[in-house]
């Protein structure tokens, strides 16, 4: 039985070949050590002690339970339970729906998440910052600060109700571009269709994926990576020019500054030097109040893009 590190490293290595198709992913779910690692990763996270629809928490793990879970995966009798829907308050006074999976589903989802991350993480665009290792809303804000400083036009987008409206068929088709393993695809579809319980009433899910599901963030990034790559391609056709034209008034002041500095080097008395220094201060003040490049240069265009989850 291979260690989880070797399994995941092998997946990452194969994923570097764009044409490679993964055919036997499902058997990774038969590796007990993958569940030990999954347990370690999710045990200490806030919220994982919350009861799912089965009324059990993650501290009830045992080897016999894992063995039973693996057997149900082998014969594909495993069926995810509906998540328990609860509502989390937001800063604006509204609430956000959160689906709490059962204990067994958390374990299986974490194993699937690790597998998908090993395959896809290296192919996501640098413009994507949500739900990724070593990335966060802070790295997204830093990217905005560095990339958008001095820009005149902004388009802010929020995909309304994204997690509730993801098209399952489109998502499955995207997964099939790299995964040629029907059992793995069927398992992911089971998670998407598991539904949820709200006030002990079952609701089917024919689109979307539950916020709170462990595999939902990686599936969201796989889905929205198409948007990221489209924007990258669109920017290639949108961008124009190699260098933005300098602002004429700024260039004039820069030339005047060079002349004054040249005179300052040859000034012979304090009165003359004081006059020139004051002139330099006036020029610098005027320069700082205007852009150094033409703000609306029609011959130079750039499109920049940053995404965090369903906000871009």
Feature names for model-found ranges:
Residues 1-312:
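Non-catalytic terminal/accessory segments
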